[in-house]
């Protein structure tokens, strides 16, 4: 009775195409199930990656950290972002999920932290994204012995830890709410 009244079809069972790992069958099943709700379909063909060399001016320890993590070259959009940022241009990068956007901003930030003592403030809308970014920065810093410190500064950061974040962080990762509630009203402490 509930399914008949529901807007959504029943959830797929834990067997069949998904359990078998057959993606084509899964997609075909979803298309059949949601045929009245699908208004269009577009398939984009696979495209080979385009690559570029690491920038020669990249701080050597940062280049070594990338190599330690298996990154010996950049995608062309990462290198293009590097070139624009280093030239002082405002830069927006729009690429698909999992295409390496993180390095587009982490490379210039880490390079500036290592060569100029620069600090950075990262804003993310969710705690999960913030934690992922801190983990990524920490792993890269540790891989190259960079000593760059990234910390989360959010509503769950204990009061005694907030001072440490303010004084020791090279990269502070927070969210818009915390920026307005906990950082801007106390900007003189930063």
Give a label for each model feature.
Residues 53, 57-190:
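Conserved P-loop/Walker A NTP-binding site and adjacent catalytic elements of P-loop NTPases
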């Amino acid at each position: 009775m509930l399914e008949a009244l529901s807007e959504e079809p029943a959830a797929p069972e834990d067997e069949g195409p998904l359990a078998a790992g057959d993606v084509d069958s899964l997609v075909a099943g979803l298309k059949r199930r949601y045929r009245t709700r699908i208004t269009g379909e577009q398939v984009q063909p696979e495209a080979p990656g385009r690559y570029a060399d690491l920038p020669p001016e990249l701080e050597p320890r940062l280049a070594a950290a990338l190599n330690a993590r298996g990154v010996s070259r950049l995608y062309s959009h990462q290198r293009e972002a590097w070139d624009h940022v280093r030239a002082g241009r405002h830069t927006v990068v729009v690429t698909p999920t999992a295409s390496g956007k993180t390095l587009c901003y982490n490379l210039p930030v880490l390079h500036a932290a290592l060569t100029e003592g620069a600090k950075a403030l990262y804003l993310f809308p969710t705690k999960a994204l913030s934690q992922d970014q801190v983990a990524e920065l920490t792993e890269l810093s540790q891989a190259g012995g960079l000593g760059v410190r990234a910390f989360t500064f959010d509503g769950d950061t204990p009061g005694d830890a907030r001072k440490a974040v303010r004084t020791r962080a090279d990269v502070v990762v927070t969210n818009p709410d915390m920026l307005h509630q906990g950082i801007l009203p106390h900007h003189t402490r930063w």
